[in-house]
Amino acid sequence: ACDELLVLVRQCVELGFTEIVLDDVQFPNYGRVERMTFGEQEDTPQLRMDAILTFLDAVNTELDGTGVTLSISLPADLLETQTDETAGWDLSAIAQKVDRIYMDAADQAEADTARTALSALREDADGKVFYAAETAEPVTGGSYVIG
């Protein structure tokens, strides 16, 4: 599946896309997860997190030198938990692999809180660009997407 996604990324670059937004980059974290298997290796939280980061590295390799922004959409509750071992998410590690993170924000206060928290994860990134609020209403002080 990873190879097919990388082909799609290459095609998007060739078509002139300026940003790739990844959504649902995760292992299943709801339903009957105890019945799911992920290959012959012993399934561990670290194995899942490493798989997500390896995938992001592969996408970055495809995008290297293209100027295309790599973004990811993640749930806002990840700000509090920082990790979701079932899904394979480690927010701090993911933040080092992407140019922008999209998260839900109900209002301006939530957007500001998320921007501050996420900006702390990447000192080399402009917080107003690194975090993009997914909101029903426009927010000030940064990027947003109205959903």
Walk through the language-model features, giving the residues of each:
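Residue-level preference for long, well-ordered alpha-helices that form the structural scaffold
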Residues: A1, Q41-I52, A87, E110-A114
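A general structural detector for well-ordered alpha-helical segments in enzyme core domains, enriched
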Residues: L8, I52-V59, A87-I94, T113-L121
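Active-site-proximal loop/short-helix segments
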Residues: T18-M49
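Aromatic-lined carbohydrate-recognition surfaces of secreted/lumenal glycan-active proteins
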Residues: V21-D23, Q46-T86, A125-A136
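Distinct, well-ordered alpha-helical segments
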Residues: V33-E34, E80-S92
